């Protein structure tokens, strides 16, 4: 059974401001309460085939080994992780809009036998994880944009 979940939000900044915060994977847990840890394990950061460990604090505490599938900074990154019989392909895009804002999008495709346990409650919890992650990332990126504007 395949499951597709997605979330999006608009941010008052450019994709570069979002990427400036997002690319520092080792710092995610400092500003993102859904992440307990994130650290590179193999390869060069953000290169196809590179691996990192993603520790989630919620909706349930778990560590997911992740491999980068594609990365095109500052606009797109995708990775795949496997846990509890689930293959999860997770994508992020940061798309500039004509009004100067950025559409932040994330989507994830889950497959494998473990998806049988993805009831409505689990899906809502994952969507809440996306919303909380993007709320924190948006806050940080908009702060970076305001600071850049103040310096110019």
Q: Language-model segments: which ranges?
A:
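A conserved amphipathic terminal alpha-helix motif
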Residues: 103, 109-152
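Residue-level detector of beta-strand structural context in well-folded domains
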Residues: 7-9, 50, 66-67, 92
């Amino acid at each position: 059974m395949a499951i597709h979940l997605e979330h999006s939000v608009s941010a008052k900044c450019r994709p570069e401001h979002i990427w400036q915060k997002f690319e520092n994977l080792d710092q995610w847990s400092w500003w993102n309460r859904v992440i307990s840890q994130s650290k590179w394990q193999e390869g060069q950061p953000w290169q196809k085939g590179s691996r990192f460990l993603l520790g989630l604090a919620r909706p349930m505490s778990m560590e997911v080994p992740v491999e980068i599938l594609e990365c095109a900074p500052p606009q797109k990154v995708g990775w795949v992780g496997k846990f509890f019989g689930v293959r999860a392909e997770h994508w992020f895009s940061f798309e500039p809009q004509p009004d100067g804002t950025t559409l932040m999008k994330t989507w994830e495709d889950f497959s494998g036998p473990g998806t049988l346990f993805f009831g409505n409650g689990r899906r809502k919890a994952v969507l809440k994880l996306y919303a909380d992650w993007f709320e924190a990332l948006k806050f940080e990126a908009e702060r970076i944009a305001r600071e850049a504007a103040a310096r110019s």
